[in-house]
């Protein structure tokens, strides 16, 4: 789903909802670029040694993430240390700051309008730069179809890394079910793919989406990120 028209539209033609979304996207584009800086990969995690073992209390910073994203203490601590590359389209781009909360070392490469079928070059570049980590989160499919062969090419480049594949919810577009069927098939085909069923989790939850029914609202971003984290991190 292309947001280019929204991004370049004059401010006075946007609704309050659209203007807020545009600002969110622009902020997350900056954050995503910053995640690619190797100097940013080391110092942003919560201090997981900040425990109060004598009283048995969970530190406030850990407890906040537990509540917000419905995670266990152990999952939050794992997330602070996990190496993860998140590669996707504007749906993932919108979640950049949320992902960074749970996974401070995450590398986010997400752009508006990205298609799976032309993502191979970008994956190769991330790999060349040492930014394709051992865990790869794929958030593609919102903008159109791809073939099994194109998906295979992507997986060949990714190699034996653990892949977390998020399926899609685009009820206004004819390709939604075909994309999700392909992803189901690929999750069965590849042992190193874990399917994250955003389509199922978000069913019947209109408040989780902005007015376009595709991009998550603020609440939806929390639900989206929490679902990812609960699938990526051991319980």
Where are these regions (language model features)?
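Catalytic His-Asp segment of secreted/periplasmic serine-dependent ester chemistry enzymes
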Residues: 180-235
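Conserved beta-strand segments of alpha/beta enzyme cores
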Residues: 105-107, 162, 192-194
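Solvent-exposed, polar/charged alpha-helical surfaces in well-ordered, non-transmembrane soluble domains
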Residues: 85, 93, 97, 101, ...
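Conserved SGNH/GDSL esterase-like catalytic core that processes O-acyl groups on lipids
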Residues: 74-150, 170-177
């Amino acid at each position: 789903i292309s947001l280019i028209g929204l991004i370049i539209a004059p401010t006075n033609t946007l609704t309050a909802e659209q203007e807020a979304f545009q600002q969110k996207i622009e902020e997350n584009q900056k954050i995503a670029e910053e995640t690619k800086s190797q100097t940013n990969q080391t110092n942003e995690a919560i201090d997981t040694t900040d425990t109060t073992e004598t009283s048995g209390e969970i530190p406030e910073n850990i407890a906040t993430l537990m509540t917000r994203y419905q995670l266990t203490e152990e999952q939050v601590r794992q997330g602070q240390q996990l190496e993860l590359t998140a590669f996707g389209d504007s749906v993932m781009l919108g979640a950049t700051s949320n992902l960074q909360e749970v996974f401070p070392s995450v590398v986010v490469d997400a752009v508006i309008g990205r298609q799976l079928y032309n993502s191979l070059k970008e994956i190769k570049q991330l790999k060349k730069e040492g930014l394709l980590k051992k865990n790869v989160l794929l958030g593609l499919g919102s903008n159109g179809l791809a073939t099994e062969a194109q998906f295979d090419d992507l997986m060949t480049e990714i190699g034996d890394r653990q892949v977390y594949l998020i399926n899609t919810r685009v009820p206004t577009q004819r390709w939604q079910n075909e994309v999700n069927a392909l992803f189901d098939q690929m999750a069965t085909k590849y042992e190193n793919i874990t399917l994250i069923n955003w389509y199922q989790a978000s069913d019947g939850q209109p408040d989780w989406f902005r007015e376009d029914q595709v991009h998550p609202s603020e609440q939806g971003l929390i639900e989206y990120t929490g679902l990812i984290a609960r699938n990526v991190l051991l319980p």
